[in-house]
């Protein structure tokens, strides 16, 4: 045991390595390498529009799955994959896209720099600040240049997989703490039983033990090591409480450090050994409980044997019951656990006890057989106590078997739940694909609606321009009408002087008004066709409104179109009113023309009467005077005659009060 302590101290010496003596060149080269790798990955991300740093956690996940399948079996590897996949789905669904990409990239680069040999120092902190600043200031906003749908599952894996590994690490840490607590409890019990064993030894052997301890302390100068090497059975049990760690704990910590180093080299902080299979851990705990119970039973038997040996020393008559003289328990603390009292049993009760204890572990069966002295035949209390211990051990074994059965049932339940989760995940994937297709179709419909709205806006602008042009024409027509009215008034004023010129001007004016009326009717037809087209478009928009309830923009566009159509209808009604006024003016002009023609006919009739009277007078007058009188009058023709009167009948009623257009 002395050599073991020396070897352990020698093994721990190389672990205390001084980092100050490391060269500056190596550290600067290391961080320069980090910067070069980071710059190359960012360049590849920008050129190929894909974030390659997300592939590193995926590669770690594949390695951890392979290690779990290799060392812990298929069931645990499948369970680990399902848990990781569930965590990835949760991160994918509930974390926004920008924050998901930011957290994933930041975590990858921080973890990459964290797992260095120097640990936390100024260069690592500066690199962390640089990475976080670049991710938050530049890459957090520029997500348009990347394939978001392709990178998003990998980003979710970068967050979900570390969460799963941290959960398994926390579980292993809690189990480790519980194991240490159990070891401390067992250590206290062993200390108590060791004190009982020491008190059961004869005083001479206690004096020898003290002398040996003093010699060891004087030789090595180790006053703190009292009785850490007394018993080799249940781990070293220190008598002095100053010794905080025993040899198994030191070896466990050294193994933990070696595992941490291997994890830093290979998995960069993700230790697969921390992911323990729950069934194996439960079986180990059951074995540990059985060993603890057997060790407790062995200690009780040893205590009973030492009491019997003390009685044997006090009573010489009871030495006949022993068949073997070597039944004295060795008093040296180093060889106590190696040499058990070889005292064979000689009665049927001990044989029954051996049959009952043969169901337990085979390693402790021989110890139980050898530790029962023969003078217990005369002690029924000890036998009763041993029988009670056997019953307790059987009950403990049954409880451990029940726990094992419960664990197996839990394993089957977990496998069934895993299958259900897989089926649910398939359904969720199908639903997600359907929703993505619907979203794509909705986006396409929205783009088409935008195009239709833009086209309608262009058409509305064209209609507004046409409307302004028509309004200008109407203003010009009004001006022309006023001018025509003024000219008509002037023509009426000069009608008495120039009857023939008035009729010609009136005819030309009538022709112009009819041409204008035809133009206006054509314009009205064109406007009516446009109104019909607009009404059809409005109906289409209403149908689209019924189909698409969420398109508020189209509703506003429809309302605007309705307002514009109403405005156009109002303008068209005003135009029709103007046309009616023009037709009424035309009727008035025709009536005036008919009246003028009637007056002309009356004048012609009067001229005829006058001519007849002149003829009668000339007939009465003498021929000389007649010839003289008629010679200058023969070439003269009346100015107003019936030849100039238009004989075409008019379709207008001169007695009509108000002009009424014909209904179509």
Swiss-Prot record:
Keywords: Endoplasmic reticulum, Glycoprotein, Membrane, Nucleus, Phosphoprotein, Transmembrane, Transmembrane helix. Strong expression in whole nervous system up to 12.5 dpc. Highly expressed in all neuronal differentiation fields from 14.5 dpc to birth, with highest expression in the telencephalic cortical plate and mitral cells in the olfactory bulb, and lower expression in neuronal progenitor zones. Progressively decreased expression in fields of neuron precursor proliferation from 14.5 dpc and virtually undetectable there by 17.5 dpc. No significant expression detected outside the nervous system. After birth, significant expression remains in the cerebellum, olfactory bulb and hippocampus. Residues 320-348 have a biased composition (Polar residues). One of its GO terms (biological process) is neuronal signal transduction. Residues 253-265 have a biased composition (Basic and acidic residues). Plays a role in the regulation of neuronal activity. Belongs to the macoilin family. This is Macoilin. It comes from Mus musculus. The gene is Maco1.
């Amino acid at each position: 045991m002395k050599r073991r302590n020396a070897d352990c101290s020698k093994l721990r010496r190389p672990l205390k390595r001084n980092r100050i003596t490391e060269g500056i060149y190596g550290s600067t080269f290391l961080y320069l390498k980090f910067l070069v790798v980071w710059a190359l990955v960012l360049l590849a991300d920008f050129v190929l529009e894909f974030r390659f740093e997300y592939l590193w956690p995926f590669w770690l996940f594949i390695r951890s799955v392979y290690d779990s399948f290799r060392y812990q079996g298929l069931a645990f590897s499948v369970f680990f994959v399902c848990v990781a996949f569930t965590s990835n789905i949760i991160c994918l669904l509930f974390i926004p896209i920008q924050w998901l990409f930011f957290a994933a990239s930041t975590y990858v680069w921080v973890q990459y720099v964290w797992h260095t040999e120097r640990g936390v120092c100024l260069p690592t902190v500066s690199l962390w600040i640089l990475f976080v600043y670049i991710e938050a200031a530049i890459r957090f906003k520029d997500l348009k240049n990347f394939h978001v749908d392709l990178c998003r599952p990998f980003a979710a894996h970068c967050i979900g997989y570390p969460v799963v590994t941290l959960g398994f690490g926390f579980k292993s840490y809690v189990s480790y703490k519980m194991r240490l607590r159990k070891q401390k409890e067992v250590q206290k019990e062993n200390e108590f039983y060791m004190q009982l064993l020491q008190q059961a030894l004869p005083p001479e052997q206690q004096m020898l033990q003290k002398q040996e301890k003093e010699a060891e302390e004087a030789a090595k100068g180790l006053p703190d090591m009292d009785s850490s090497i007394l018993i080799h059975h249940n781990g070293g049990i220190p008598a002095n409480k100053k010794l905080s760690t025993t040899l198994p704990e030191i070896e466990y910590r050294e193994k933990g450090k070696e595992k941490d180093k291997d994890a830093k080299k290979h998995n960069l902080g993700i230790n697969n050994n921390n992911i323990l299979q729950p069934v194996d851990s439960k079986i180990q705990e059951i074995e540990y409980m059985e060993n603890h119970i057997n060790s407790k039973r062995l200690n009780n038997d040893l205590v009973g044997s030492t009491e019997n040996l003390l009685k044997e020393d006090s009573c010489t008559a009871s030495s006949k019951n022993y068949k073997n003289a070597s039944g004295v328990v060795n008093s040296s603390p180093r060889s106590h656990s190696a040499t058990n009292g070889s005292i064979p049993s000689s009665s049927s009760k001990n044989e029954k006890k051996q049959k009952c204890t043969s169901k337990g572990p085979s390693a402790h069966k021989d110890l139980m057989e050898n530790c029962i002295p023969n003078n217990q035949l005369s002690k029924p209390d000890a036998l009763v106590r041993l029988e009670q211990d056997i019953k307790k051990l059987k009950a403990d074994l049954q409880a451990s078997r029940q726990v094992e059965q419960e664990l197996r049932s839990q394993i089957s339940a977990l496998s069934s739940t895993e299958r259900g989760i897989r089926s649910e995940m398939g359904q969720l994937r199908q639903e997600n694909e359907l929703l993505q297709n619907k979203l794509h179709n909705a986006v396409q419909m929205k783009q088409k609606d935008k195009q239709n709205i833009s086209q309608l806006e262009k058409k509305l602008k064209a209609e507004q321009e046409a409307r302004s042009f028509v309004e200008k024409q109407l203003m010009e027509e009004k001006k022309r009408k006023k001018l025509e009215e003024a000219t008509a008034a002037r023509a009426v004023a000069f009608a008495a002087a120039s009857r023939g010129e008035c009729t010609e001007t009136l005819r030309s004016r009538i022709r112009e008004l009819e041409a204008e009326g035809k133009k206006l009717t054509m314009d009205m037809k064109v406007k009516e066709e446009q109104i019909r087209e607009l009404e059809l478009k409005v109906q289409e928009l209403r149908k689209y409104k019924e189909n698409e309830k969420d398109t508020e923009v189209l509703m506003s566009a429809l309302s605007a179109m309705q307002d514009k159509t109403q405005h156009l209808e109002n303008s068209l009604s005003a135009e029709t009113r103007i046309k009616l006024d023009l037709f009424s003016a035309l009727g008035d002009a025709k009536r005036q023309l008919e009246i003028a023609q009637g007056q002309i006919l009356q004048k012609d009739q009067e001229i005829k009467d006058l001519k007849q009277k002149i003829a009668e007078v000339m007939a009465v007058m003498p021929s000389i005077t007649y010839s003289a009188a008629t010679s200058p009058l023969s070439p003269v023709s009346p100015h107003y005659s019936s030849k100039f009167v238009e004989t075409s009948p008019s379709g207008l009623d001169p007695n009509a009060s108000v002009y009424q257009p014909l209904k179509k």
